[in-house]
Design a protein with these regions (language model features):
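Extreme N-terminal basic, low-complexity initiation segments
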Residues: 2-13
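A broadly tuned "polar low-complexity/structure-edge" signature
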Residues: 2-3, 66, 74-76, 317-318, ...
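Acidic-enriched and Gly/Ser
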Residues: 26-32, 38-172
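P-loop NTPase catalytic core
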Residues: 179-180, 186-468
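Low-complexity, intrinsically disordered or signal/transmembrane-proximal segments
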Residues: 18-19, 23
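P-loop NTPase nucleotide-binding/switch module
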Residues: 112, 138-187, 201-205, 240-252, ...
């Protein structure tokens, strides 16, 4: 049927052009009549009825076979504004949807109309803007100009066999990362930390230190009061001009918080496909997973791992794999840094463990280091970049290995040093670590706004290792 409809549209367009040019003689007159009749038809909406409301789930009937998982609905209550919802499940011939906003005023019997699937008309006019996951401005300015072709927010990753290789080393502007967790263009890195350790501060440092054509921020479940603080204090007008901020605050519905991550990834893909180098900063993947858990439990999906339904661990790689280099010949890449909020400082909890296995490296922020006054509180012994062997030069690799060895040895004896029970002379390697580790720690300490690059970082490390 679809092919026939396309053929009719093609034939009718051809006959209209010929008719208008005065060459319609000899053509079948019934084609003209058919084309005119098709143009006069009004599109018919697919609609159903709300039959039940329970918690986050909305039960609907009458949508028929044209509705599918992921389709959007416009729910029309007897009074009040329409409510957007998304179909999340089918059960016993009924559809179950999750609202994208408050459902106050919605009641059984409300009309549900099938709406277009989510797509974003991204354009260069989005640069410098703060938007919600639907592309609606949050900065008080008019809506940005629409792109020529809207992009679907739920899109597959580029085919694995056709993706470009990772690019050259990318300077992050943070000494601890440039030394011990170096990154290449198109790499995906996780920032793992408990609450209140300094993830947001580190993200602000990265936003100011990484050389990128476009920066895309995904603020998923962010505190409402922190949005302007982040934009005005951490980002600033200069970096905002080349950035797109997608935000769904903590009071937004679960589908909106989930959609913030997909929308930000879609925006990043738009600029990557133009051949630009994109830095994607997402805070946080954990809140994305929590939104997925709310949706799954609302439609009665069984909890499997610490209350997380299986679909959560299916969606995580679908999102994270979209970042990285584009297809061969694209020229652009998405270098992505994802924060992971570990619950109770447990770095082996399910979301952290799953994300760590997907990404190309992980950086651990330690509360004890932060309490000791060293910022950023990166635990270099527990941090890893899987691309480090291909990034570090021949003269840099032994420096990093030696620094790691000294820090590891010092970690074993520092309690003895603090208690005054350590005796110099019993272990030469421990003596060296006790002497040099504080100098290495000073190299790792860096104030917010303090500039750095890999050459400066390795120069400072050489000087620290050379101290007597």
């Amino acid at each position: 049927m679809d092919g026939g409809a396309r053929a009719v549209r093609s034939d009718s367009a051809l006959t209209r052009r010929q008719y208008r040019a005065g060459h319609g003689a000899g053509m079948r007159p019934d084609l003209f009549a058919t084309a005119a009749a098709l143009r006069s038809l009004q599109p018919q909406a697919v609609h159903g009825t709300v039959t039940g409301l329970g918690g986050l789930a909305i039960t609907l009937e009458g949508l028929g076979p044209l509705a599918a998982i992921g389709d959007r609905l416009r729910l029309e209550p007897p009074s009040g504004a329409p409510v957007l919802a998304e179909i999340a499940a089918f059960r016993d011939g009924r559809a179950e949807a999750i609202a994208l906003g408050p459902i106050n005023g919605l009641s059984a019997g409300a009309r549900a109309v099938l709406a277009p699937r989510p797509a974003l008309p991204v354009s260069d006019a989005w640069l410098g803007r703060v938007l919600d996951p639907m592309g609606v401005p949050m900065d008080g300015q008019p809506p940005p100009a629409r792109g020529a072709l809207p992009r679907a927010t739920h899109a597959p990753a580029p085919p694995a066999g056709q993706r470009a290789r990772l690019g050259p080393r990318l300077a992050l502007g943070v000494r601890a990362l440039d030394l011990f967790a170096p990154v290449r263009q198109g790499q995906r890195l996780g920032l793992f930390a408990a609450s209140g350790v300094g993830k947001s501060t580190l993200m602000a440092m990265l936003a100011g230190g990484v050389a990128a054509d476009v920066i895309v921020f995904a603020l998923v479940g962010e505190r409402g009061r922190e949005l302007r603080e982040f934009i005005e204090d951490d980002l600033g007008p200069e970096r905002l001009a080349k950035s797109v901020v997608i935000c769904a605050t903590s009071d937004a519905a679960a589908p909106m918080r989930r959609e913030a991550a997909y929308a930000a990834m879609t925006v990043a893909e738009h600029f990557r496909d133009q051949g630009r180098q994109v830095l994607l900063l997402m805070d946080s993947v954990t809140r994305f997973a929590l939104a997925l858990r709310e949706i799954g439990l609302a439609v009665r999906e069984p909890p499997a791992t610490r209350g997380y339904p299986p679909s959560v661990f299916t969606e995580l790689p679908r999102l994270l794999e979209r970042a990285g280099p584009g297809p061969d010949g694209c020229g652009g890449a998405i270098t992505a840094l994802f924060t992971v909020l570990v619950e109770g400082d447990d770095h082996d909890e399910p979301v952290a463990d799953a994300v760590r296995g997907i990404l190309d490296g992980h950086v651990v922020l330690d509360r004890r280091i932060a309490e000791g006054g060293r910022y950023p509180p990166v635990d270099v012994l527990r941090s890893l970049s899987r691309t480090a062997p291909g990034v570090l030069d021949a003269h840099e690799r032994p420096l990093v290995q030696e620094a790691r060895r000294l820090l590891s040895t010092y970690a074993e004896v520092k309690d003895l040093v603090r208690l005054g029970a350590y005796r110099v002379g019993h272990d030469p390697q421990a003596d060296q670590a006790v002497r040099l580790a504080p100098a290495i720690e000073q190299v790792l300490a860096q104030a917010k706004g303090e500039p750095s690059d890999p050459d400066q970082a390795f120069g400072a490390l050489v000087a620290a290792l050379a101290e007597a």
